[in-house]
Design a protein with these regions (language model features):
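Small-residue-enriched, tightly packed secondary-structure blocks
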Residues: 75-133
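Beta-strand segments within the central parallel beta-sheet cores of soluble alpha/beta enzyme folds
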Residues: 97-106, 138-149
């Protein structure tokens, strides 16, 4: 893992990375190929199975720290995916060593900075999908998305780590103050960022906004690991329920749309 970390920081060429990690050049065309009847990634150790990969209990606080630092390397989706998969590399190894951590880099800013689904949810969704069967992915990720929409970010815990200069993996100069909190009422990147900008008074280009998103990455990675640990232990129970307001909207408009988002985050109530 240490060697991989060094290469990620140095930005080595793809060919050099493949050579040093032992991944065959044939894998470069598609590190993981999905779909019925299509073989998984070819590696020196064989074929990476399409069935869920092994999961072991992880440290959620370590996930917070890794995700925060990784955000400043390649964005939010990368950060939360990296936090979980890098720890599984450390504790499980095997197939996780053949999954390129940069594959979620496209998800920054909701996907190429277009602002749809928050990249933090995209990243943890990909990680959850690696370890859980489809039915459980929907349960765990669905509950996580619901939690995201109603939770003030950054959390007090993330702010406290910053004030204590506890983000030990960061390579940038720290912002060691508590930041304003906001609740998005939406899983969308642009809604989340806009609500925080309105609450904090900072602009989208301010270092504090980037720090907000870094702490948000930590919060979401932390929560995802907590939920995955409970899922692994057989104790996970989904708790999120749509609001009465949203349920009322869906009672009339449920056949006219797909989703569980708060309707009034985009539409006027009527």
């Amino acid at each position: 893992m240490e060697e991989v970390e060094k290469m990620l920081h140095k930005g080595v060429s793809r060919r050099s990375f493949l050579k040093k990690t032992g991944v065959g050049l044939g894998v470069a065309a598609g590190a993981l190929m999905f779909g019925t009847g299509i073989a998984g990634a070819q590696t020196q150790g064989g074929v990476v199975p399409e069935s869920p990969l092994p999961y072991v209990e992880l440290d959620p606080e370590e996930a917070r720290l890794r995700a925060h630092a990784a955000y400043f390397r390649s964005g939010c989706a990368y950060a939360t995916f990296y936090a979980i998969v890098s720890m599984l590399r450390d504790k499980v190894g095997g197939p996780y060593n053949q999954i390129p951590l940069r594959m979620l880099g496209y998800g920054r800013g909701g996907a190429a900075s277009w602002g749809p689904l928050c990249g933090t949810l995209n990243g943890v969704g990909a990680a959850i999908n690696l370890v859980a069967p489809d039915a459980d992915v929907n349960k765990v990720l669905g509950d996580l998305i619901g939690w995201y929409t109603i939770t003030p970010f950054p959390s007090k815990e993330s702010n406290d780590v910053a004030v204590a200069n506890g983000y030990k993996y960061d390579t940038k100069a720290p912002i060691s103050v508590a930041l304003a909190q906001s609740t998005s009422n939406s899983p969308l990147c642009h809604a989340s960022v806009a609500s925080w900008i309105k609450e904090s008074g900072f602009s989208a280009s301010a270092p504090e906004r980037a720090e907000h998103c870094g702490r948000l990455c930590g919060d979401v990675a932390y929560k995802a690991v907590m939920m995955l640990n409970a899922w692994k232990a057989g104790t996970f129970t989904a708790t999120f329920k749509v609001s009465d307001e949203t349920a009322g909207c869906l009672s009339c408009h449920g056949d006219q749309q797909v989703g569980k988002m708060s309707c009034t985050s985009c539409h006027d109530a009527h």
